[in-house]
A protein has these predicted regions:
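Hydrophobic packing positions characteristic
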Residues: 2-175
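Intrinsic low-complexity, repeat-rich intrinsically disordered segments enriched
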Residues: 160-246
Length: 246
């Protein structure tokens, strides 16, 4: 008996839908993940997929993804890095084709496997935030490099002001020297200098004003005259004055 046309069409539609569902189920594009471990030497991580997979009519937990390359902002010989720890949230993105040879050798490579949009070809971008893990106090007027709690930050404001703040210690090391050019420099706090202190400005020098008191442990020289070792001529008893220091 011939099969009715409507039944044929229905069967074709069901077949096409089944194929589409199968392709959709196997195709990976992007999904959230949770870092389980990070290897700073290989710059890769192990990631738990944060969404369940679909198998048949039910859902199942996907196995952790291993050797996932971590993406740090990088270019022109400079890289922005930050700690990656267990529990950090990330976005997993999946390459169109197999990345094995590229990951091992860089450059332009052949695809060793015909797989596409596969779980094996993931990259991890650390930073997406669920509502359970989001930070607060985000500045709406400046760019900040900050700790999650906001206690320490480097800020570049739209008005050109730059601010550095930390409850901890600020350390700077410059082996090639340090130059600061500013109309005024204000230091609020005690200052300790481990090294020599000199004043430039050519032969005329510059002025120095201090409220004092000033305590000097060793000698002081003014105009080449030693405060400790200088002598005076014309010394005599009485109310007369000595001559200028030698």
């Amino acid at each position: 008996m011939p099969i009715p046309t409507q039944s044929q069409i229905g069967g074709e539609q069901q077949t096409a839908q089944a194929i589409a569902d199968s392709v959709s189920t196997q195709m990976r594009v992007a999904m959230p993940g949770i870092i389980q471990s990070f290897d700073p030497d290989t710059v890769t991580c192990t990631v738990e997929v944060a969404l369940r997979g679909i198998v048949g009519d039910g859902s199942t937990e996907l196995k952790p993804l291993v050797d996932v390359p971590v993406i740090f902002p990088r270019g022109g010989g400079c890289t922005l890095t930050f700690p990656v720890k267990e529990g950090d949230e990330c976005l997993l993105i999946f390459a169109d084709r197999c990345i094995d040879f590229w990951w091992q050798s860089g450059g332009v490579q052949e695809t060793v496997d015909p797989r596409q949009h596969d779980l094996s070809d993931a990259f991890a971008i650390v930073g997406p935030q669920s509502q359970a893990q989001k930070i607060s106090g985000i500045s709406t007027s400046a760019a900040q490099l900050r700790t999650d709690d906001g206690a320490a930050f480097v800020e570049v404001a739209a008005g050109h002001n730059i601010t550095v703040k930390t409850p901890g210690q600020l350390t700077a090391t410059a082996e090639g020297g340090t130059t600061i050019t500013s109309p005024t420099i204000t230091l609020n706090g005690n200052v300790t200098i481990n090294g020599n202190l000199s004043q430039g400005m050519g032969e005329s020098g510059g002025t120095a004003t201090m409220l004092g008191p000033v305590t000097v442990t060793n000698d002081v020289k003014a105009g080449g005259k030693s405060l400790i070792q200088h002598t005076h001529g014309g010394v005599q008893n009485g109310s007369g004055n000595t001559t200028a220091p030698n």
